[in-house]
Amino acid sequence: MPTTFQEIPRERPVTPLLDRADTPAGLRRLAEADLETLADELRQELLYTVGQTGGHFGAGLGVIELTIALHYVFDTPDDRLVWDVGHQAYPHKILTGRRNRMLSLRQKDGIAAFPRRSESEYDTFGVGHSSTSISAALGMAIAARLQNSARKSIAVIGDGALTAGMAFEALNHAQEVNADMLVILNDNDMSISRNVGGLSNYLAKILSSRTYASMREGSKKVLSRLPGAWEIARRTEEYAKGMLVPGTLFEELGWNYIGPIDGHDLPTMIATLRNMRDLKGPQFLHVVTKKGKGFAPAEVDPIGYHAITKLEPADKPAAPKKVSGPKYSAVFGQWLCDMAAADNRLVGITPAMKEGSDLVDFSERYPQRYFDVAIAEQHAVTLAAGMACEGSKPVVAIYSTFLQRAYDQLIHDVAVQNLDVLFAIDRAGLVGEDGPTHAGSYDLSYLRCIPGMLVMTPSDENELRKMLSTGHLYNGPAAVRYPRGTGPNAPISGDLQPLEIGKGVVRRQGEKIALLVFGVQLAEAMQVAEQINATVVDMRFVKPLDEALVLELAGSHELLVTIEENAIMGGAGAAVGEFLASQAVLKPLLHLGLPDIYVEHAKPAQMLAECGLDAAGIEASVKARMAKLGL
């Protein structure tokens, strides 16, 4: 069984077996008896790597043995291995030729946080969002069948990701087409079953064996001529399996369910995977693992160790504390509790983001009004719509990148019916090391085209609080988008008063140049304005746009510059340009925002600089346009 470590090593561990097995070909040359020692070495290597770089932590520790077993038994990359989400894929990356690059993990121009097709042939499908693996692996299995290929397709999905409807849609379709594929449920929360042990492991070996499969198919052919006898045999088998395993649901969906087995028992996993490798039809293996396995603190606190920051050198002097405000998510969490105390109609809804969206306090103070729907964004939005129909005032706390998954529900179920649903959209804009799959780059573009939608962009913590109150009191759907991280430490008012809808605020009066800011780049715009004597406007509202103010600025300035941390195409700046065009106003415009590319992972400051959204970039772009216009 795995060794349990107490500390994260600061020096690279000695790993003689891993040195020979950092590719699947090298791994398969090892004796099976050496694999448990290899697992200990791989676990130490992962601890060291993430300690140096920061990143997702607990999930990878929990799949060390599973990752080794998969690459040992299957002929990757010819056999297609698809990881769901990708939080757990660091061991996979180490074992597939990227060990020497792992210290660049999540850094600019380095290894990505998630599997990427462009990074390695072993990353067969790019991921980041949850619940896509079964659909992708099914598509690969069907393609293999059409190409007369014998390659295997394997999806590894967690118990959390299996709560999403998309996963069950794929499970249902796979049995319809009788796909030859394997789905592995990595149950690291024991939320489906606690029935793991010697008897369950033994049963899994029997049920997955070729002998059992051959006997089962042979009996089916014989007994199918005697319908009564076959029905009795089928029910007897189901009863036997149902007594020992929680696979009834998957069996009813047409899958051959095996498990649960201990995901840290390498011999059992290897034997079971070998048995299942050549079975025909949809196969489902339930593996129970422990998140954070092998690192004692993470086993005790898997949520706290979901991800960690990098270790600082032991002898490094403490850096002076940077003065910054509270996290935007914390401001939202406090507002939610305050408004809930003032309005008993308020309910809070989140798709599995209680900690990330800062809903812990609300969930404890108002448990009857808190709803975590798991990874089910579509359901979350329509649930809110149903509540709003009956007079509740739902607040959906959701990351920008995940709201994309519920766009139809946002339009069809909320907006068309003009329901009072407030969307608190966290992680808007660039999010840093998680890269383009998690960036909130598009919400302004896809929200502002929806009729009746109120769309707001706070420039600081106090503006966020006021906009949340504005959205809560608005008659219709409303959205407030705010970034990851901390604010500029603006004084926060304790009241719950709303803003006047559709009105921006001039923060600095200048001449010739007007900087129209939608969001948190206000501080950078103020710095630039001091250098070029520009007017600075906190636009506040993307929809409805402060059209009167835009016309006034166009009439009194020679260049309008829009600034937003959203895709330029279709964003807030585009709204300004469209409005001026509709009024037949010809005015030089410069739109600064996210370019028409996927901005790769790096530190947030590096990403903003790359996009020209830091103070230096804004100043350079504005001065270049001024020179072109002769200003």
Swiss-Prot record:
GO terms for molecular function: 1-deoxy-D-xylulose-5-phosphate synthase activity; magnesium ion binding; thiamine pyrophosphate binding. This is 1-deoxy-D-xylulose-5-phosphate synthase. Its cofactor is Mg(2+); thiamine diphosphate. Binds 1 Mg(2+) ion per subunit. Keywords: Isoprene biosynthesis, Magnesium, Metal-binding, Thiamine biosynthesis, Thiamine pyrophosphate, Transferase. Transmembrane segments: none annotated. Thiamine diphosphate binds at residues 87, 128-130, 160-161, 188, 295, 377. The keyword Chaperone does not apply. Homodimer. Belongs to the transketolase family. DXPS subfamily. It is an enzyme of class 2 (transferase). GO terms for cellular component: cytosol. It comes from Pseudomonas putida (strain GB-1). One of its GO terms (biological process) is terpenoid biosynthetic process. Its EC number is 2.2.1.7. It catalyses: D-glyceraldehyde 3-phosphate + pyruvate + H(+) = 1-deoxy-D-xylulose 5-phosphate + CO2. Pathway: Metabolic intermediate biosynthesis; 1-deoxy-D-xylulose 5-phosphate biosynthesis; 1-deoxy-D-xylulose 5-phosphate from D-glyceraldehyde 3-phosphate and pyruvate: step 1/1. Catalyzes the acyloin condensation reaction between C atoms 2 and 3 of pyruvate and glyceraldehyde 3-phosphate to yield 1-deoxy-D-xylulose-5-phosphate (DXP). CDD domains: TPP_DXS, TPP_PYR_DXS_TK_like.
